[in-house]
């Protein structure tokens, strides 16, 4: 099924597919992504031919939702406030949890926020491609390649975005793993000053 992003019931329909444990393709705040609930990860890994050891990014509706999933005792209040102040933006943050790590992003996109609100929980997001290949941004190519395997593709036109910046704050020293379309100034943490937002 193909839906246009601007269609009136697009969010409700997309949400219903996700809640049925389907993997869908949606336009995100950066590029097109495979998305779904955590319980649909096995399906996603099969479609994408991705190694299950590679963790997925999860999208959240509001910055403060991250506090439910991370080890807040690992961070100072300033550090927590600093990271949350940079959302919503195309910034993926790998946090420490009680037992391992989790990668979260709070997207700066009204449509995505509406979808996350409708679903009522975080959803995974990973680039549309076969693992090891370049991410796909041309919607015609995406439809041609995945329409048989994916029950719902949301058409938001061609996206010429840049992948999100990824930072790892699950251990010290904190570091940038991937430079994307967003810049974060880590010096603010070491200097103990108020964060600069870009």
Task: Show the residue positions of the predicted features.
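Active-site-adjacent structural elements in enzyme catalytic cores
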Residues: 1-198
